[in-house]
C-alpha cells in the first residue's frame, strides 16, 4: 500500500468517482482539498463537512500548493491550471492510478472506441459463472476504488482514454484495445494518433494483450509480440466461420459456440464475444463457464437494443453509438427486409463523418438527421436525408412512413449533450416515441 500521509492532495471533480477518491484518502489518514468547476456538482451533499472545497472554478493556488493532484477524467491535462501545476513538478494522476497501486487481485483492463462496456460485462459474467468473486467497474458502473471495499479474485475494468492518460502503474493480467476510430477529437487536437497513444497505455506491463486482427491501430507500439492474442470477424486466433449455413465462434480452429445461441444481435456483438472469450481464456476462466455466460448474456441497454416491434417493424435503440465507428459497427451485417430508417445526429465532437457514406447508399436507406451536426450528417447523402431540429420531430415523420419489414435504428454517431443530459436520456426518449408512433 502506498503511504499518502504527508502529501498535500487536491481532488478535481466530485460525483461518484470524486467521492470514492475522498473516501479512499481519508481512510489512509489524508484529508484532501476538493475543487469542481461546477457550483453544485453531483455528490456535493455527501462530501464530509471537514473537507475543504472550492466550487465554480479551479483554484490555481491550491493546485500549485499540492504535492499530488487526483483529477477527473473530464478535465484535460492541457487545461492551463493543470499544465502550470505539472510544470511546477506537481504529480497528476487519476482514480485508476490510485486503484492500480492498491489492487492485489489480477486485473483485466478493457478499452476501445466501441464495445468496451459490453465486453467488460461479458467478462464479468464469465468470471461470476465460474464462481469467482469479481469486481466490475471503472468507466462503467462502480468507480474502481469502490471495488477495493470487497474481497475479489478478479477485477474487470472498463477504461477510457481519459482515464488511461493519468494511469502509470497498471499491470493488467490481460488487456485489450478492441478497436480504434475517431472519437473525442475535440480533446485530441493532434488527431487520431494522439488518441491512440492514450489507448495503448493499457498494454504497458500487461501479461497478455488481446488485439483486433482487423485493426492495426490496436497493436502495441512495437507491434505484434509474444504477449498478443488476436480476434476478428474474418481472421485471428478467435474468429468467425460459416459452417452448414450457420456462423460459429471459433478459437484456434475449434468451434466453440454457434452465433445463433447468443441473445444479442449484430455481427459486432459476435466479435465482442470473441474478444471476451480471448480475455477469459487468458485469465484461466473455465471455458464451460464462459460459454454458459455468453448464452445467457442479454446485452446492455442503449446498445443495439430491440425496444419495440409491432406490425413487422423493428425499432432498435443504439443511443450509446456516440462516434462514427460505433455506428459503422451497428450497420455492418445488418439485415433489413424493407427500408432502413437511420437516425443520426447530435454533437459529433469534431469527427469526420465521411466513413459512414458507403453504408448510406441505395434506395432502401432513409436518413433522419437532427441536432447540432444534423446538417453535416445530412450532407453525406442529401437525396435520402430528412433534416429536423429534434429527435422527436424525426420520429414522428418516421412513424408516418414505416411499413412492415422496415427497421428503425437510432445509432447517432454523435454525443448527446447538445440536446440531452446523456445518451441514456436520448435512448429513453427514442424508446418512448417508438412505442408511441410505432
Swiss-Prot record:
Keyword Ligase: yes
GO molecular function annotation: ATP binding; UDP-N-acetylmuramoylalanine-D-glutamate ligase activity
Biological process according to GO: cell division; cell wall organization; peptidoglycan biosynthetic process; regulation of cell shape
Keyword Lyase belongs to the record: no
Residues reported to bind ATP: 112-118
Biological pathway: Cell wall biogenesis; peptidoglycan biosynthesis
Main location: cytoplasm
Cited Gene3D superfamilies: Mur ligase, C-terminal domain (3.90.190.20), Mur-like, catalytic domain (3.40.1190.10), NAD(P)-binding Rossmann-like Domain (3.40.50.720)
Any one Pfam family match given in the protein's UniProt record, by short name: MurD-like_N
GO cellular component: cytoplasm
EC class (word): ligase
Cellular location(s): Cytoplasm
PANTHER family per UniProt: UDP-N-ACETYLMURAMOYLALANINE--D-GLUTAMATE LIGASE
Protein known as: UDP-N-acetylmuramoylalanine--D-glutamate ligase
UniProt organism field: Sodalis glossinidius (strain morsitans)
Gene expressing this chain: murD
Amino acid at each position: 500500500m502506498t503511504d499518502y500521509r504527508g502529501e498535500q492532495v487536491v481532488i478535481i471533480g466530485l460525483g461518484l468517482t470524486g467521492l470514492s477518491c475522498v473516501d479512499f484518502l481519508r481512510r489512509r489518514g489524508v484529508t484532501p482539498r476538493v475543487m469542481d468547476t461546477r457550483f453544485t456538482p453531483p455528490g456535493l451533499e455527501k462530501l464530509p463537512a471537514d473537507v475543504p472545497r472550492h466550487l465554480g472554478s479551479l483554484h490555481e493556488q491550491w493546485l500549485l500548493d499540492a504535492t499530488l493532484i487526483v483529477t477527473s477524467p473530464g478535465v484535460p491535462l492541457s487545461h492551463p491550471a493543470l499544465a502550470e501545476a505539472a510544470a511546477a513538478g506537481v504529480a497528476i494522476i487519476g482514480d485508476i492510478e490510485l486503484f492500480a497501486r492498491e489492487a492485489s487481485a489480477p486485473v483485466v483492463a478493457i478499452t476501445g472506441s466501441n464495445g468496451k462496456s459490453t465486453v467488460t460485462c461479458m467478462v464479468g459474467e464469465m468470471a461470476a459463472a465460474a464462481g469467482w468473486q469479481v469486481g466490475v467497474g471503472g468507466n462503467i458502473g462502480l468507480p474502481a476504488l469502490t471495488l477495493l471495499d470487497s474481497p475479489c479474485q478478479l477485477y474487470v475494468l472498463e477504461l477510457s482514454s481519459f482515464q488511461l492518460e493519468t494511469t502509470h502503474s497498471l499491470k493488467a493480467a490481460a488487456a485489450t484495445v478492441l478497436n480504434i476510430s475517431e472519437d473525442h477529437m475535440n480533446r485530441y487536437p493532434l488527431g487520431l494518433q494522439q488518441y491512440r497513444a492514450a489507448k495503448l497505455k493499457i498494454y504497458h506491463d500487461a501479461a497478455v494483450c488481446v488485439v483486433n486482427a482487423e485493426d492495426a491501430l490496436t497493436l502495441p507500439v512495437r507491434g505484434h509480440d509474444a504477449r498478443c492474442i488476436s480476434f476478428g470477424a474474418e481472421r485471428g486466433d478467435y474468429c468467425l466461420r460459416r459452417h452448414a449455413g450457420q456462423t460459429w465462434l471459433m478459437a484456434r480452429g475449434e468451434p466453440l459456440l454457434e452465433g445463433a445461441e447468443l441473445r444479442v444481435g449484430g455481427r459486432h456483438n459476435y466479435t465482442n464475444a470473441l474478444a471476451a472469450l480471448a480475455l477469459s481464456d487468458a485469465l484461466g476462466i473455465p471455458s464451460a463457464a464462459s460459454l454458459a455466460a455468453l448464452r445467457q448474456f442479454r446485452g446492455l441497454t442503449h446498445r443495439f437494443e430491440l425496444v419495440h416491434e409491432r406490425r413487422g417493424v423493428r425499432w432498435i435503440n443504439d443511443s450509446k453509438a456516440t462516434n462514427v465507428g460505433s455506428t459503422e459497427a451497428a450497420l455492418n451485417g445488418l439485415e433489413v427486409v424493407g427500408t432502413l430508417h437511420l437516425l443520426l445526429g447530435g454533437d459529433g465532437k469534431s469527427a469526420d463523418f465521411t466513413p459512414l457514406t458507403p453504408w448510406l447508399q441505395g434506395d432502401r436507406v432513409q436518413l433522419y438527421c437532427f441536432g447540432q451536426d444534423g446538417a453535416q450528417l445530412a450532407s453525406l447523402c442529401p437525396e435520402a436525408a430528412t433534416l429536423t431540429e429534434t429527435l422527436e420531430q424525426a420520429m414522428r415523420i418516421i412513424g408516418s412512413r414505416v411499413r412492415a419489414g422496415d427497421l428503425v435504428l437510432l445509432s447517432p454517431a454523435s454525443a448527446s449533450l447538445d440536446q440531452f443530459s446523456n445518451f441514456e436520456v436520448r435512448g429513453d426518449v427514442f424508446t418512448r416515441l417508438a412505442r408511441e408512433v410505432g
